[in-house]
Design a protein with these regions (language model features):
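Primarily recognizes the serine-hydrolase "nucleophile elbow" in alpha/beta-hydrolase
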Residues: 62-101
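Serine-hydrolase catalytic machinery in alpha/beta-hydrolase-like enzymes
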Residues: 2-74
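A domain-start/cap signature at the N-terminus of enzymes
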Residues: 1-2, 83
Length: 101
């Protein structure tokens, strides 16, 4: 049984913060393939407007998963915090995947 988790951090809540760090550890021990989104440098770029930041984050997120064959996975989990929840929802809709937990 193939399983994957994609982790979407918040703007001020990174992958090394307790909620995401320990959840990632649990998914790792359960044999999940894991993808970590790391778009904090985009969000912290003071030269970009919020609209440009969000556009660049969406481009980054899609680039990270464009070659993933989600059809081979029996279980797909999106783990997210704050702005990451928005991006996870947008990605799920864009990919047309209904069976995401």
């Amino acid at each position: 049984m193939k399983k994957i988790v994609i982790i979407f951090p918040g703007a001020g809540y990174g992958l090394d913060s307790p909620l995401l760090y320990y959840a990632d550890f649990i998914y790792e021990t359960k044999g999940f393939d894991r993808i970590h989104m790391n778009y904090q440098s985009i969000l912290s770029n003071t030269e970009l407007s919020i609209e440009n930041k969000l556009t660049k984050v969406r481009e980054y997120v899609f680039e990270q998963v464009k070659d993933v064959n989600f059809a081979v996975y029996d279980e797909i989990v999106f783990l997210s915090k704050s702005i990451g929840s928005v991006e996870a929802g947008i990605l799920a809709e864009r990919l047309g995947i209904k069976a995401i937990r």
